[in-house]
Amino acid sequence: MSSSLGKEKDCKEKDPKVSSAKEREKEAKASGGFGKESKDRETKTKGKEAKDGKKDSSSAQPGVAFSVDNTIKRPNPAPGARKKSSNAEVIKELNKCREENSVRLDLAKRSIHLLPSSIKELTQLTELYLYGNKLQSLPAEVGCLVNLETLALSENSLTSLPDSLGNLKQLRMVDLRHNKLREIPPVVYRLTSLTTLYLRFNRITSVEKDIKNLSNLTMLSIRENKIKQLPAEIGELCNLITLDVAHNQLEHLPKEIGNCTQITKLDLQHNELLDLPDTIGNLSTLKSLGLRYNRLSAIPRTLAQCSKLDELNLENNIISTLPEGLLSSLVNLTSLTLARNCFQSYPVGGPSQFSTIYALNMEHNRINKIPFGIFSRAKVLSKLNMKDNQLTSLPLDFGTWTSMVELNLATNQLNKIPEDVSGLVSLEVLVLSNNLLRNLPHGIGNLRKLRELDLEENKLESLPNEIAYLRDLQIP
């Protein structure tokens, strides 16, 4: 094979008319491609060429059955052929499911436009996956699948659901993400056994009072819609564990949210929230609270009652202070983000407020100093982001931050890094770009774990020789 390919290359580089028939025969024998029959075919081909007045390009290289130009191309399928083929495959899957009495049917990503009405025969189904198709509607016959527990319909073009779905009394999970719903289909409010409901990425503008019927819900995701308010009846979802209403247009939360005392995750980021109800303090099991990118100017004191909270994100609001002692009360808090607000100083509450914090982000505020001793109890603080503030110096106990792994001090007004930076022996990332530094302390050579050091946009004239000790430092 390799010999034949080599000859093909030769044929392209050299005019085949130059080579004699004898030479070509010799080459063909060397490649094992010629016998008497091949020679006869060559003679016939030459005769045909002479008759036609042109040379067949495929005969320029004996031993090669087809040239690239002569490859047979399949015609494009007639319009509708693919759709018919898809429908045939779907019917085949339905028949197979019925014959095998399967309880799970996966028809995802089959380019299905219309589900066959014969789906009604599969009454044994408990799981039906139809995501990633081109469905604009469902046949009423789906309502015959009375044992169905899981119905996955995401990534279609559904604008409504048939009322017959109300017959599905066993439904536990419905996934309607990425469709074209302008409202929560009325039949959904009748699916009282639902525990999980996904409605993300639709065009829904409101949640009706009938949401109270879904009292078994533990997970409700209605993020990335156009919802402007939640009804008071949301408070009747007493089993709710996760509520995701992010990326909507909410300005207020109903005070009844405080009745959802089982919630552990509440995501309200990217709304237009102006305030929070005091009843949020009733969410005693809350662990994660997302409030970034809203218009909050204050946080209620009652949040201190959410003692199990381990993640609090308040990025990009207009908050200038927190209630005194709030952070000290949140004894399980490990991640705190206060970036892009209006803080001019650290929250009031003393060192105890950071004793459990693992990651603190204060980026893009107006803070001009880090108080001495503020991290004296922060034994697990390993990530501190103070980028884009107004720091002119670092505290005298800077060298005691021995657990620090990532430290971002970029875009401040620092003109000096203390010599006791040598105490930050766990440091792996140090960002000092966009400051006023003219030199670095010799103690930086003690940061043997340092792998990233950003010094861009400073006034450095030289670097200490001790930089050479940083064996793990990665230079871009």
Tell where the protein language model's regions lie, with residue ranges.
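Short, glycine/acidic-rich beta->alpha junctions
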Residues: 459
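The feature captures the LRR N-terminal capping module
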Residues: 1-431, 436-442, 449-452, 462-465, ...
